C-alpha cells in the first residue's frame, strides 16, 4: 500500500477471538457512524446465541451465511408486539439471500455443518 494517499485507501486490522467452537472476528468498526462488519466460523453442532443488545446499544443486523448452513433463531423482545417472546427459526444455506434482524430481537444460530457467517451491525 505504499504510495497510496490515505484519503483514497485505508487499511484496517481485524480482531479475531478463537475458541473450541470456532472464531468470531470484528473485521471493521466505525464508532462514529455506529456500524461494524463481523464474521464468525462455527464448527458443526455449535449453537451461538441468544444475543440481544439493549438501548443505548441496540443494534440491527444484516446476516448472511457465506459457507455451510445454519438454523437461525429470532425472538422479538418488543413488548408492544403481538408476537412478543415467540421463537422463530428457519434454515439458511450458503449463497442465499441476506436477512435483516431488527434491533428489538434476540438472535442466535445453530451450525448444521461447519459454517462461515457474516453480519453487518448498525447501532441505534
Explain the meaning of each model-derived region:
Residues 91-113:
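Conserved metal-binding segment of the jelly-roll/cupin
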Residues 1-92, 115-124:
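Non-catalytic, conserved peripheral segments adjacent to functional cores
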Amino acid at each position: 500500500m505504499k504510495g497510496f494517499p490515505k484519503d483514497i485507501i485505508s487499511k484496517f486490522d481485524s480482531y479475531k477471538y478463537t475458541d473450541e467452537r470456532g472464531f468470531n472476528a470484528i473485521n471493521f468498526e466505525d464508532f462514529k457512524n455506529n456500524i461494524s462488519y463481523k464474521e464468525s466460523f462455527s464448527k458443526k453442532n455449535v449453537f451461538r446465541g441468544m444475543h440481544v443488545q439493549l438501548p443505548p446499544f441496540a443494534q440491527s443486523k444484516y446476516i448472511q451465511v457465506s459457507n455451510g448452513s445454519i438454523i437461525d433463531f429470532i425472538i422479538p423482545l418488543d413488548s408492544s408486539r403481538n408476537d412478543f417472546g415467540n421463537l422463530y427459526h428457519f434454515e439458511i444455506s450458503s449463497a442465499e439471500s441476506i436477512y435483516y434482524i431488527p434491533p428489538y430481537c434476540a438472535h442466535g444460530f445453530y451450525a448444521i455443518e461447519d459454517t462461515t457467517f457474516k453480519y453487518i451491525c448498525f447501532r441505534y
